[in-house]
Amino acid sequence: MPSQTPIITLTPELQVQLKEHTEGLLNNIIHTNLRTRFVQEFDGLRKFRDAFELLKDHSAHETWECYRDSVPLTNYSTYEPFISRFLAEPCREDDVKDILSPGLPFFIAKSSGTSGKAAKLFPKYRHFIGTAPSRNPTAAKGCHILSMTYLQVIDVLRNEGNSTKVVVTASSSGTVRMQHDLTIEKDAEVIKMTLPNTTSPIAVGHIRNYRSFLLMHALFALAEENLTFFYATYSTLFLDLIMFMEEEWATLLNSIENGIIPDFEDMHHVREYLEPKLLPNLSRAQKLREIGESKGESGWLFKIWPELQQVKCIVSGLFATTIPKIRHYLGPEVLINSRGMGASEGYIGESCSFTDLNLFKLATKEFIEYLDIMKDPSPANLVPAWEVETGRRYEVFLTTRDGLWRYRLEDIIEVAGFDSGDGIPLLRYVERLK
């Protein structure tokens, strides 16, 4: 969040600070991915390769100038011939190692196809922060609506004769797996566990039936009176959970009273792992029955969970239409917080305000450039973070740790100002490129 009141224009000192930071970020990304297959084989980077070899000291500023003048714009079709190597049968390590970033990806993110377009695949690699921070085991619990399912498992054959498994899954699921080092090889053991400070056992995340998946998250959340947060990818996911919970209210309360997992669809493969996790709780069930008399009223969820502090999910863009309904369910006491602005390709901005849910502070893990929407898409028209102007709208281009170079994201943002502490731009999501 902004350290102080946002400013409209960067001071000279903050502009220099932001420039040095951003150039350093780009320098690290380029030096990390310089020897990858994509950089060495993609003909569009030939000019960059030749120019980079002639640099004297490869300083951050020198690297930025080389990149600025020689790297073309790219889109998904640029990477598809390289990413498609993961789909070959057999998939051999020699063919896919160091494709976009060093080593093998931890998982491959599959974007959801929109506007009739086919879904896209993006290899995701483990970087310096590979595991999630430890949590206080005595802290209050929350419901993290998380799926652990995957769409495909790719067996990458190693030269030694063994293989490594790489899952194709949603970016949210893959990221949590990567943060907690939950490789698919560990699933048989991990499925018996519950992550720290979360209400739902990991086995719930292995339910593929959408309704059953959300109902089981609801069941374990209802059983926890001292619930403090809900985390969901999208606001619609949270609202669907509440809707299904209302529909199956009596069944869920009977399960809590008797400690019995309900017989919802497509749960046979996880039932044995869930049954030991739900203990009979007559008093909780009775209290919920009393609360159920006001089901659907404003603030109803706060009556169920009087310790609830926030619901965190994507509520910007098209999802902003869900905010009034969420606020009705929560009442005035509970905060609604945005999860940030991002895509399968990369993370753009961090949540910046509890009152303005479409305000984000530029994330500092990827190098982001901006194209004024009134200008033609060309490398010469891109500007870096230290040259954007408040009030202007830009199309976003990403150069990422996972190996994308000036990738056209087709998202439009508006610059809302700058953090007065470090000069980082503040952004608002506007729309997809039409």
Task: Walk through the language-model features, giving the residues of each.
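Conserved AMP-binding A3 loop
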Residues: 106-140
